[in-house]
Amino acid sequence: MTHNPNIIWHPAAISKSDRQSLNGHKSCVLWFTGLSGSGKSVLANAVDEKLYRKGIQSYVLDGDNIRHGLNKDLGFQTGDRIENIRRIGEVAKLFVDSGQMILTAFISPFREDRDMVRALFPKGEFFEIYVKCPLHVCEQRDPKGLYKKARNGEIKHFTGIDSPYEAPLSPDFIIESDQTSISDGADLIINALQNRGII
């Protein structure tokens, strides 16, 4: 879709830096990516809880939850997956512009799509977190029973089974969820954010 020259951008009266100053912290997106069952949502919510306890303005966008509303019109074909991530990238940008920390938990299987979202943000506002977990461990966990359905042919285009997952080449963080507890993984991320002066 091309840009319509008749639609004009209206500048905000209050800047992002003003909102960050009011909140007492910087804003950024923590983009959790990994296979289904790797622990993205659980880890994102654990980080969110720790941020909340520190008085940080934060919010989690979860891949499943978003498909109940904003993206309920999208399926799992390649084009729909791309649009799913594009929309979330734009929503995440709005949150960051509002001065908040936004945590997104989406499989987001394609590098090109994740790079597309990264390009929306200046350096230091987008952090890719690879929640790494072997496929066989994710299948053993199978919290939603989706791997079993995919193996039985009941679900098509399922990431890791009949649709690829492209692991990040240079993520900002790697949390190996089969070797690191959720609490320890969340602490690693919180400590890194503090060391970088984000919070």
From Swiss-Prot:
Question: Where, in this chain's numbering, is ATP bound?
Answer: G34, L35, S36, G37, S38, G39, K40, S41
Q: Which domain of life is it from?
A: Bacteria
| Record pathway | Sulfur metabolism; hydrogen sulfide biosynthesis; sulfite from sulfate: step 2/3
Active site (catalytic residues): S108
Look at the named UniProt entry and state the broad enzyme category this protein falls under: transferase
One Gene Ontology term of the molecular function aspect: adenylylsulfate kinase activity
The record's keywords, sorted A to Z, are: ATP-binding, Kinase, Nucleotide-binding, Phosphoprotein, Transferase
For biological process, the GO terms are: hydrogen sulfide biosynthetic process; sulfate assimilation
Where along the sequence do coiled-coil regions lie? none
Family annotation (PANTHER family): BIFUNCTIONAL 3'-PHOSPHOADENOSINE 5'-PHOSPHOSULFATE SYNTHASE, PAPS SYNTHETASE, ISOFORM D
The task this protein performs is described as: Catalyzes the synthesis of activated sulfate.
What this protein is called in its record is: Probable adenylyl-sulfate kinase
- Can you name the source organism? Bacillus subtilis (strain 168)
